[in-house]
From Swiss-Prot:
This is F-box/kelch-repeat protein At4g39550. Residues 1-27 are annotated as: Disordered. Component of SCF(ASK-cullin-F-box) E3 ubiquitin ligase complexes, which may mediate the ubiquitination and subsequent proteasomal degradation of target proteins. Transmembrane segments: none annotated. Kelch repeats lie at residues 148-194, 195-242, 244-285. The lineage of its organism: Eukaryota, Viridiplantae, Streptophyta, Embryophyta, Tracheophyta. The F-box is necessary for the interaction with ASK proteins. One of its GO terms (biological process) is protein ubiquitination.
């Protein structure tokens, strides 16, 4: 009798687990940080709106360490607006690109441009920084060193103060720095080789040893600086700037301090005029100022002021109504104009221009307007107090 045929056992293969259909699966934080570090910081305000995790990563120290290691640090424009000098809460903004700057939009705009001649938007705006506990800036000295902005001195309850507040432009948080040796109100603050020199604004101008002091951010210490003498120092300083490592101080006399030599000298008359009462800035060791639609620069060799050539397409603005700043070797200019809305309400429109600079020979510097546009609208009572460009 034949043995029965053995039946083969069949086993069903388990059905494969369905793969995730999420178009953007989550990535490890270190990979996201590596990607973000390669993106211009002009896009960070927009990227921070994507999610809470993005917002957290954009404010993380790891991101900025990576940017530094990759050589991706860049100059970033920061603007402080204040409601006259009595406003206890100034508002801070940074220049960024609008969220809708995409390739599709650019192509669409180019097609529209062929149909009608209309000025295209530059895509730049001033984005508000959600920074808390900002001290008034109107009567303080403000400078940028590295990725920090220092708010130095100024009145506290209408009195002189030695307080130093530091805005970390990576995390957008304030912290207190070491206080000055002397209480000051509306001091001049300048940076030479990473050190901050603070001048004037003292209560007691008769004590010349108080006139200038210097802060070293690396050692976090203040030291006194030799004085030119109380008789020519004085309490008030109209303007100050740094050119070729020397501090120019425009007061009733006009002084120059040379930190490397530790000595003072009188400013030449031809340099003492012009820039003192107007909007000005220093870009790559050249002092510029604006007056009646013309930008001028000081030729230190010939000891005279020359016109900046080639700047076209900018509207005129008040000689003292604008603010100028070094923006990574270019010149950034802010000014305002009054606009009326449909309901008759008057506001202030803040405009900005970025000008590329080119020295063609020892006697000629040319400027080219890369873009200019309205970047913010604020209530009429606000004004631009400072424009600075820390490196972040």
């Amino acid at each position: 009798m034949s043995s029965p045929e053995k039946k083969r056992k069949t086993t069903k293969k388990p059905s494969p687990t369905p793969q995730s259909t999420t178009p953007n699966p989550s990535l490890p934080d270190d990979l996201v940080v590596s990607c973000l570090a390669r993106v211009s910081r002009l896009y960070y305000p927009t990227l921070s709106l994507v999610s809470k995790s993005f917002r957290s990563l954009i404010a993380s120290p790891d991101l900025y360490k990576t940017r530094s290691l990759l050589g991706r640090t860049e100059s970033c424009l920061y603007v402080c607006l204040q409601e006259k000098d009595s406003d206890p809460n100034p508002r801070w903004f940074t220049l960024c690109l609008k969220p809708n700057r995409t390739l599709t939009n650019d192509i669409t705009e180019k097609k529209k441009k062929k149909k009608k001649k209309k000025k295209m938007s530059s895509g730049y705006v001033l984005a508000a920084i959600p920074v808390l506990h900002s001290r008034p800036a109107y009567w303080s000295g403000l400078v940028a060193v590295g990725s920090n902005i220092y708010n130095i001195g100024g009145p506290i309850d209408k009195a002189h103060s030695s307080i130093v507040s530091v805005l970390d432009c990576q995390s957008h948080t304030w912290h207190e720095g070491p206080g000055m040796r002397v209480e000051r109100r509306y001091p001049a603050a300048n940076v030479v080789e990473g050190k901050i020199y603070v001048t004037g604004g003292c209560k007691d101008c008769s004590n010349s040893s108080n006139w200038m002091e210097v802060f070293d951010p690396r050692t976090q210490t203040w030291e006194s600086v030799s004085s030119p003498g109380a008789e020519i120092g004085g309490c008030s300083i109209h303007k100050s700037a740094v050119v070729e490592g020397e501090i120019l101080i425009a007061n009733s006399h006009g002084l120059i301090y040379k930190p490397k030599e530790g000595r003072w000298e009188r400013m030449k008359w031809d340099m003492d005029i012009g820039w003192v009462w107007y909007s000005y800035c220093v870009v790559e060791n050249v002092l510029y100022y604006y007056y009646k639609g013309v930008f001028k620069w000081y030729d230190t060799m010939a000891r005279l002021w020359r016109d900046l050539k080639g700047v076209k397409g900018l509207p005129r603005f008040a000689r003292c109504g604008g603010k100028m700043a070094d923006y990574g070797g270019k010149m950034a200019v802010f000014w305002d104009k009054i606009v009326t809305s449909d309901d008759g309400c008057k506001n202030k429109m803040i405009l900005c221009a970025v000008i590329a600079l080119e020295r063609r020979n020892s006697e000629e510097i040319w400027g080219k307007v890369e873009w200019h546009d309205a970047v913010l609208t604020v209530p009429l009572s606000y004004e631009v107090v400072y424009a600075l460009s820390p490196t972040v």
